[in-house]
Amino acid sequence: MALIKIEKKGNVFIVTLNDKIKGNVINPEALSAHRKVLTELEAVSENSAVIVTSSDPKSWCVGLDFEWLKGQSAEEFTGTFRELEEVFGQWAFLALPTVGCITGHCLAGGAIFASVLDFRLMRSDKGWFAFTEIDVKIPLSPILYEMADLLPNKHAVRELLLTGRRIGGADAQKLRVVDEAHLPDMLMPRALEIAEELYQKDLKTYNAMKQLLKQNLSKRIAEESNA
């Protein structure tokens, strides 16, 4: 079973996180699957857009795989953490419009992943969005902080990071953590509507705007790589 599936519907690539057993946890195997998909998407030259969804109706991405983490040395964990930063950075600056279709729980690293996408839609009736790092005692790196800070509501970012508060889709929309919240049967159709509108934009202009919106993250990545 592929951990991540990719298919094309017209001019829209649908990337499906496909680890129903573990809730699309992040571990080296998952990061490798992300890199494979990103390599395919980075080679796309025609106008397109990307939706990232999940085959699991309960979870979109619940963050680090703690079962895997228990057996890792500090050095191994640091290496995986850096790879996570690199993969999420690739998603942040992918030269195609990206839409997160959040079908369920979006926690910790999963919430960071959602934050780097251009737009976010979330299920309104079930599922939590939360930065749970404070409760699991894993502080964000400077790069991951800048990724979380891409969310437009800075007050919400501060509160969610410092409290670990879990919010549902409706509250996430009110706090502008997600752009829209919908019942499950409307979630993917609405994501497709947005993606189909976005792929028609001039990609050169779109990506120039994206670089401006995410310039603090870009600067932080450059600083860390030169340190």
Segments (PLM) and residue ranges:
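Glycine- (often His-adjacent) and acidic-residue-rich active-site loop
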Residues: 54-86
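Hydrophobic/aromatic residues within transmembrane alpha-helices
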Residues: 52-53, 65, 113-115, 172, ...
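Glycine-rich beta-to-alpha active-site loop
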Residues: 87-136
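Conserved CoA-thioester-binding segment of acyl-CoA-metabolizing enzymes
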Residues: 1-53, 89
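Short helix- or helix-capping micro-motifs
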Residues: 62-64, 156-164
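Amphipathic alpha-helical segments at domain termini/boundaries
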Residues: 1-18, 160-199, 208-220, 227
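Short, active-site-adjacent cap segments at secondary-structure transitions
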Residues: 57-61, 107-108, 216
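Hydrophobic, secondary-structure "cap" segments at the distal end of domains
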Residues: 144-155
